[in-house]
Amino acid sequence: LTGGEPLVRPRMPQLVEKLKNMPGIEKVTLTTNGVLLKDQMRDFARAGLDGLNISLDTLDETCSRRITRRDELGRTLEGISEALKYPEISLKINCVPLGIPDQDLCKVAFLARDHKVHVRFIEMMPIGMGKEFHGVSEEELLGILGEKLPRFSPYVGEPLGNGPCHYYDVDGFSGKIGFISAVSHKFCGECNRIRLTSQGFLKTCLQYAAGRDLRAVIRGGGSDEELKAVILEALAEKPDGHAFGGGLEKQKDDKTEKLCMAQIGG
């Protein structure tokens, strides 16, 4: 469950509980900025939430205000602290390196030393507002982290999820450091993701605006079988891969998605 910000939706824990009780649903996770998490965390635990991904791009207050245009870093950290009280719920921190000097990515990484959390660095994808940032490739990021972090080596244990992230063990760390590098390390061949936006639009690839309007099918009186057929059509037309190229250069052509990730759900 992504967003925008899913916790602004009323009765979100109740939705999680309903999803958990549906046949065929194996796991329910939620991505949030954490601002509204503290007061809802107990309810999510009772609902059976399996995992939390909390977006945190920096621990610097000034930098956080510039990125988010809000002064809410303290509330996000309170949400993380509350989530740590429920070890049965997998907790991951999502950080998007933006190529700005005061983001202090190493400080974010050290959260995995001090707490039982996995910190994942997600490469900026040049869609929506992401086209305006240079971003940081995985190789650049490994160099930055290598200057301050202890020795780290590829993690070879049991999978820590069903997505594209690959992880590293770091000496003395409680959690792992992970990388989701869609541009510099293209993984489209293993992609197992589709997204349903808050407007009911089914997207099969983040780069492209193509997909299916499921809300229109439902509001048009479509049956469950008709809805299933539309979903299967969309899956059959899922692109082989994105065309961002091998670098993180700005992409301004008409092929890329115009919406930002908050509008798509991420």
Outline where the language-model segments fall.
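Auxiliary Fe-S-binding modules of radical SAM enzymes
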Residues: D114, M124-I127, K131-G266
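Radical SAM/AdoMet-radical enzyme domain recognition
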Residues: L1, E5, R9-I122
